[in-house]
Amino acid sequence: MTKYALVGDVGGTNARLALCDIASGEISQAKTYSGLDYPSLEAVVRVYLDEHSVSVEDGCIAIACPITGDWVAMTNHTWAFSIAEMKKNLGFSHLEIINDFTAVSMAIPMLKKEHLIQFGGGEPVDGKPIAVYGAGTGLGVAHLVHVDKRWISLPGEGGHVDFAPNSEEEAMILEILRAEIGHVSAERVLSGPGLVNLYRAIVKSDNRLPENLRPKDITERALADSCIDCRRALSLFCVIMGRFGGDLALTMGTFGGVYIAGGIVPRFLEFFKASGFRGGFEDKGRFKDYIHGIPVYLIVHDNPGLLGSGAHLRQTLGHIL
C-alpha cells in the first residue's frame, strides 16, 4: 500500500499543498490555496487533508522566510506559528518546516534533463558543491553539498548581500538607489521590485521622470521593443543575474553547477538566452578560466518547491536520494 506524506510550498500570497509518495518521491494531487482566505497555515492543511480524504503522519512544508527555530513568523504574511504545536495539533509523527530555497536546492538531485535548460559551461562534476538562486518577489539563495550519501542544503539570506557593480552603468544605478533607499542589496535589483528599481534609476540618470510601471509592464515593453528604458533595464537585469551567479560559483567552487529558479526568468526566456547573462557570469577577471566550465541551468519544473520538500522529508526519514 502506498504511503503518502504532506508536502507544501508557501509564499506570501499562495499556499500550494500536495501528496508525496514516500517510496518514490512522486508528487501528486497538488492544489493551490489563497493564503488570504485562511487564518493560519494549519487551517489550510486541514482543509487540504479533508478535501482529499487522506490520512498522513509526516509532512514537510517550505516557507519563504528564514527558519531559525520553533517559532515561524512569515515576513510577507500575517501567519505565525510554533512548529511543535502545529505538529501536535495535526497528529503528525514528523513535521519539517524549511526555507523555500532549501526546498528548491533539495529538488535538484530529483530533477531530470527535461526539467533543465543549460546556459553555457560544460558538464557538472559529481560530488562538487551546487548553488541555486532565483529572483521573484525577492532573491533566494542556497547551496547544496553531498556528504556521506546525504544531500545537505546550506540555506541563508544571500540575496541581501551588497549589490556589487562592475561597470559605469551599474555604478550609476547604485549611486541613485543608495540616495533613495540607503543600503542597496542584490535583491534590490534582482527581483520583481528590483527590475522596477533598475528602470527608475536608468530614467532618473537621464534627468527624466520615470513612469509608475509594474515589473510586468517593464518586461512587456522590453519584449515589444517599445521602450528603450525598459529594454535597458531588462538587459541589465540579465547581466547582473550573471554576475551574481558567478559570485556564488566562486564563493563555493560550485563545479556541480549553478541553478536558477524563481518565476521571473521564464517569462522572458528567449530574451534571456540572447542576453549578456553568461558574459556577466564569466566576467571574473583573473578567474574567468576558473569559472568558464561551470554549467548554469534554468529549472523549468512546475513545482520544484514541492519536489524538494518531498526529497528533504524522505531523506530525513532515512531514504537515500
From Swiss-Prot:
Which Pfam families does the entry link to? Answer: Glucokinase
| Record's GO cellular component terms | cytosol
What does it catalyze? D-glucose + ATP = D-glucose 6-phosphate + ADP + H(+)
Protein EC: 2.7.1.2
Cellular location of this protein? Cytoplasm
The protein's GO terms of the molecular function aspect are:
ATP binding; D-glucose binding; glucokinase activity
- Organism domain of life: Bacteria
Where does the chain bind ATP?
A: 8-13
Q: Which UniProt keywords apply?
A: ATP-binding, Cytoplasm, Glycolysis, Kinase, Nucleotide-binding, Transferase
Q: Which GO terms describe its biological process?
A: glycolytic process
HAMAP family noted in UniProt: Glucokinase (MF_00524)
Family statement: Belongs to the bacterial glucokinase family.
Q: Which PANTHER family match?
A: GLUCOKINASE
Q: What is this protein called?
A: Glucokinase
What species does this protein belong to? Answer: Salmonella paratyphi B (strain ATCC BAA-1250 / SPB7)
